[in-house]
A protein has these predicted regions:
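Positively charged, proline/Ser/Thr-rich regional signature most characteristic
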Residues: 63, 73-137, 184
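Flexible, polar/low-complexity N-terminal or interdomain linker segments that lie immediately upstream
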Residues: 30-86, 90-95, 185
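Active-site neighborhoods of enzymes that stabilize oxyanions during catalysis
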Residues: 178-185
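Solvent-exposed coil/turn segments that connect beta secondary-structure elements
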Residues: 90-92, 142, 179
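Bacterial N-terminal signal peptides
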Residues: 21-33
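Short, solvent-exposed loop/turn and secondary-structure capping segments
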Residues: 97-100, 150-152, 177
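Short polybasic linear motifs
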Residues: 1-8, 13, 19-20
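Catalytic cysteine-centered active loop of the rhodanese-like fold, especially the PTP/DSP P-loop
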Residues: 122-168, 172-174
Length: 185
């Protein structure tokens, strides 16, 4: 009889531990599942944002008719002393005077795409870019999402300049690469 009682206690303990173990395993699986779902949703939303920006950027380049240059390539061009004009399109006081790519000249453009260029801005841009329509011109702004450099490059092409590039990473990528900057005018 004692054996039966012990067996009953053993089965009772085993069942309780088994139930607890099963509960813990199921809890862990659910936690992992929820975490994986949350991660997938978060990762997916970041991927959608990246895709949206990539398509928007590609459309700007296509519409603008200009080339692209990476931050590293621009640094190489500067190191080789290639003849070019670098155009900083950020605000003079808030950005250009604080930090700009060496040799860059400044002309401010708006962030939103410009469908028209008024005569004063057109004259200022043509004066800055000069008479040589084949001159290498590189525009940049603050960072990839900024549209200022797109506007400058697009309008340089519309004005007949044929060797126009945009450095999309802007001053932010330049400084993150730990490249030298100039300050002031």
């Amino acid at each position: 009889m004692k054996c039966d009682v012990r067996r009953g206690k053993f089965l009772s303990l085993f069942t309780a531990h088994y139930s607890l173990f099963t509960f813990l395993i199921l809890g862990w699986i659910m936690t992992c599942s929820i975490s994986a779902t949350a991660y997938a949703l978060e990762w997916g939303s970041k991927e959608l944002e990246t895709e949206k920006l990539a398509v928007q950027f590609a459309n700007q380049v296509k519409k603008g008719g200009y080339g692209l240059v990476t931050t590293e390539e621009l640094k190489e061009w500067l190191d080789k002393k290639e003849p070019m004009l670098i155009v900083d399109t950020m605000p003079l006081e808030d950005s250009y005077k604080k930090n700009h790519i060496p040799t860059a000249l400044q002309i401010e453009f708006p962030v939103e795409e410009m469908s028209q260029l008024d005569e004063a801005k057109k004259a200022a841009l043509e004066e800055l870019l000069g008479p040589d329509k084949s001159r290498k011109i590189v525009s940049y702004c603050g960072f990839t999402k900024c549209g200022r450099s797109h506007n400058a490059a697009m309008w340089a092409v519309k004005l007949g300049y044929t060797n126009v590039y945009r450095q999309p990473g802007g001053i932010k990528a330049w400084m993150e690469a730990d490249y030298p900057v100039e300050k002031g005018q």
